Amino acid sequence: MRNIIISIVFLLGISSIQAQTVKEDLSEFPETMLSDMDSLYWDWQSKNLIYLDENCRMLPEGPKVSDSVYIDRLSRIPSIIEMPFNEVVKKYIEAYTGRLRNKVSFMLAAANFYMPMFEEALETYDLPMELKYLPIIESALNPKALSRQRASGLWQFMLRTSKSYGLETNSLVEERFDPQKSTWAAVRYLKDLFNIYKDWHLVLAAYNCGPGNVNKAIRRAGGSTDYWDLYPFLPKETRGYVPGFIAANYVMTYYCEHGICPMESQLPAVSDTVHINKDLHLQQVASVCNIDIEQLRSLNPQYK
């Protein structure tokens, strides 16, 4: 019989930059930047696993930053993917460091748990490490995120794409919610997209809106494969996707300079797996392993 893998927690505590001109009004914030973290999952996480650090005083607003400082800071981020600065990128950076600063604080805590698994998969497939911040704009690091278009999980897979990469969805399991399996599937998908486009900005756009829409934008842009030439021909939300990705890399690197404190996290520093060869209820597993059932559910969000 096929083994079922359940995560169990060990509670151990826890390129050159160029200023470009792009019309700002063509951009739209990705859905996760506009939505509140109000799902039952994040409600439980925030009440039980993530909390404010009493020793860190987060400023209500960050300092004013000049364009030249933004350009300099972006140039110092070690990256293979180009991170240009323009007015659209600036708008996204100021959103993350301004009205979304509490969300950033929350994501910094969750990142301690998720980033190691992202980094392992990216290193295995020899992909740019800065892609580990893609789920920041995809799902705000919510493994049970569900978009209006029914994209699901940390990496926001649509059902058809997820099945192409071996993720299972049925009455008992939704593997798009599985942090490990969805991460490895997403990295394989990104690798395949790069083999098609050979340009990381186009890969990011295709990941968000699909290769068909990117190919259509290329035709409408007269055959150009420069992302900023394609920009006005992309779907509205995708126009803000690359700027949002650049801003996510910026804020996850320079949050201290903007007076943003990471929340403290009791998410496990290390987890392990138990292989089960027959049907069991999670409550049975929790009882045998002496683990709180809600924590077990949070570590295994793929099970319905």
Language-model features: locations:
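Bacterial Sec-dependent N-terminal signal peptides
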Residues: M1-E24
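An acidic, Gly/Ser/Thr/Pro-rich helix-cap/linker signature
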Residues: Q18-Y125
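Extracytoplasmic/secreted proteins, especially bacterial periplasmic and envelope-associated proteins
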Residues: V88-K91, F106, A110-F113, M117, ...
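Substrate-binding clefts and substrate-entry loops adjacent to catalytic sites
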Residues: Y92-F106, A140-R148, Q156-K198, I218-P232, ...
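Short, functionally critical alpha-helical segments immediately adjacent to catalytic or ligand/cofactor-binding
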Residues: L127-K144, V203-G210, L296-N300
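Extracellular LysM carbohydrate-binding repeats and other cell-envelope/extracellular binding modules
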Residues: L234, L299-K304
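Catalytic cores of secreted or luminal carbohydrate-active enzymes
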Residues: K236-H258
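Primarily a LysM-type cell-wall glycan-binding module
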Residues: M263-I293
